């Protein structure tokens, strides 16, 4: 029974790490990356539509994104949505495609982004710790219902703690890599 709790816990912690990595992908480092535009939603035929569903996003150069809409009439709406998203970039529309040149990051902006990464890191760690708490509660219920002994509970709780430590150190590692990427000039 405790293996089921452990498997669920591991799965939930892995999902927390994946969510953290998706969140980090939207933080702009010095290079162009299509995931920078993941949170951009375009008003398209009256509905908020994710940009990557109505246009292809390519990276022809290290500091440039090119957005080619599937429907040319959406060009203006896409441009407005990018400006409204406040990403610190300026789109240029040539009538067929939109080019976004990624400016090099200033030292001040790098520090802001590093702070943001730290905040996301803390949020991910809190999520992992909450999962640990839930797992420990589940294990205590099993012990209370007589489905496991006190020794098994202690052992399982230690396993959950080891798992938590492992995932928290993974988060720290990912954070360190992202901060290094941001601080790279």
Swiss-Prot record:
Q: Which GO terms describe its biological process?
A: translational termination
Q: Which UniProt keywords apply?
A: Cytoplasm, Protein biosynthesis
Q: What are the GO cellular component annotations?
A: cytoplasm
GO MF assignments: ribosomal large subunit binding
The record's CDD domains line, in alphabetical order, gives:
RRF
State its location(s). Answer: Cytoplasm
Q: Which PANTHER family match?
A: MITOCHONDRIAL RIBOSOME RECYCLING FACTOR PSEUDO 1, RIBOSOME RECYCLING FACTOR
Which family does the record assign?
A: Belongs to the RRF family.
According to its UniProt entry, the function of this protein is described as: Responsible for the release of ribosomes from messenger RNA at the termination of protein biosynthesis. May increase the efficiency of translation by recycling ribosomes from one round of translation to another.
Q: Which NCBIfam families match?
A: frr
Supply the HAMAP family for this chain: RRF
This chain belongs to the protein called Ribosome-recycling factor
């Amino acid at each position: 029974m405790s293996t089921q709790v452990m498997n669920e816990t591991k799965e939930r912690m892995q999902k927390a790490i994946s969510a953290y990595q998706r969140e980090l992908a939207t933080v702009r480092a010095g290079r162009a990356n299509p995931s920078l535009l993941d949170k951009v939603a375009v008003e398209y035929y009256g509905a908020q539509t994710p940009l990557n569903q109505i246009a292809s996003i390519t990276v022809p150069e290290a500091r440039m994104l090119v957005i080619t809409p599937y429907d040319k009439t959406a060009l203006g709406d896409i441009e407005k949505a990018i400006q409204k998203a406040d990403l610190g970039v300026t789109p240029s529309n040539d009538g067929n495609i939109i080019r976004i040149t990624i400016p090099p990051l200033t030292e001040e902006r790098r520090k802001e982004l590093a702070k943001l990464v730290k905040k996301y890191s803390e949020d991910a760690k809190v999520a992992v710790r909450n999962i640990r708490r839930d797992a420990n509660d589940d294990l205590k219920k099993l012990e209370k219902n007589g489905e496991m002994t006190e020794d098994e509970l202690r052992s399982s709780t230690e396993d959950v703690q080891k798992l938590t430590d492992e995932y928290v150190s993974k988060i720290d590692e990912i954070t360190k890599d992202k901060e290094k990427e941001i601080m790279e000039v």
